[in-house]
């Protein structure tokens, strides 16, 4: 797998003419209190615990923040401070945009634009001057289904642009990645414009395949297409972070707890242009569907985790 990825990176470097941070494989924070780690410690006699410990708990994963955090600034600060103490870089996901998931399995988010601005302000203040990787609002640029009017779409773009600005101001050492959906969702032609309008010019880059299953090569091809359009229309290109947490077997066309998914390349294979990261936490449910028909979105399941380890 690593050899194949190195070959792909060699190809993509010719297409992406940006520079950026090169992260060492051990740069990123491994949270000893992640849900898989806590579950494995609390169920040490369960045969699934050893598998989860061996395959998942030692890999850096993102921590997601949303309206379930009663004090988001304090929650973010606690996570970032723990990473600082370990001399590692945390990966965070901001996930509180109004009309989140268009009312789907992960519905929720801030009540309105003002509430979101206050929330992202607090989120960014929690990071402060620490280094961090931040993925901003998964699906928010790809999922315009519930934004029926131009005004509603413009409001979404303006909120994301504000989020980038507030993160740059309050968390100047953070690498900010706007989410851009996945390789088989929104046409690159459309996504390039949305990214630009959402302030990608002021961000580090864009994120792909968050919580999805598409092979890394497909995401790289899509990133190249988007970057080509950003270059021709706006005069810049951007690095990309790709969620590889569950793309080891690629996609079968299903997005919600599909059977046959497998863990992908672990966090840390990176160049200045491409960062691979486990953004979705392996074992967390996508919703009550697929091989987890009774599991709410975001709930950790050891059975789902073991399925990803074994690829079934």
Where are these regions (language model features)?
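Cleavable N-terminal signal peptides
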Residues: 11-12, 22
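Surface-exposed substrate-engagement region within the catalytic domains
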Residues: 30-57, 183-303
């Amino acid at each position: 797998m690593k050899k194949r990825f190195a070959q792909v990176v060699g190809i993509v470097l010719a297409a992406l003419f940006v520079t950026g941070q090169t992260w060492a494989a051990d740069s990123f924070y491994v949270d000893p209190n992640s849900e898989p780690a806590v579950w494995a410690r609390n169920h040490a006699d369960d045969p699934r615990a050893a598998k989860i410990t061996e395959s998942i708990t030692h890999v850096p994963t993102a921590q997601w923040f949303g309206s379930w955090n009663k004090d988001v600034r304090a929650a973010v600060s606690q996570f970032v401070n723990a990473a600082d103490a370990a001399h590692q870089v945390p990966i965070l996901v901001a996930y509180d945009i109004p009309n989140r998931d268009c009312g789907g399995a992960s519905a929720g988010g801030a009540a309105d634009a003002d509430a979101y601005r206050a929330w992202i302000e607090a989120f960014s203040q929690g990071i402060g001057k620490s280094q961090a990787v931040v993925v901003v609002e998964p699906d928010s640029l790809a999922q315009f289904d519930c934004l029926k009017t131009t005004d509603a779409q413009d409001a979404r773009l303006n909120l994301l642009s504000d989020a980038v600005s507030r993160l740059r101001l309050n968390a100047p050492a953070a690498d900010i990645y706007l989410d851009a959906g996945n390789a088989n969702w929104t046409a690159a032609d459309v996504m390039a414009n949305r990214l630009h309008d959402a302030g990608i010019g002021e961000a580090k880059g864009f994120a792909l395949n968050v919580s999805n299953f598409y092979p890394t090569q497909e995401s790289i091809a899509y990133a190249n297409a988007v970057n080509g359009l950003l270059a021709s229309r706006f005069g810049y290109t951007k690095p990309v972070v790709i969620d590889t947490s569950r793309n080891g077997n690629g996609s079968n066309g299903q997005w919600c707890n599909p059977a046959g998914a497998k863990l992908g390349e672990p966090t840390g294979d990176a160049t200045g242009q491409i960062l691979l990261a486990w953004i979705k936490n392996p074992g967390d449910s996508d919703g009550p569907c697929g091989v987890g028909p009774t599991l709410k979105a975001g709930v950790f399941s050891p059975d789902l985790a073991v399925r990803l380890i074994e690829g079934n």
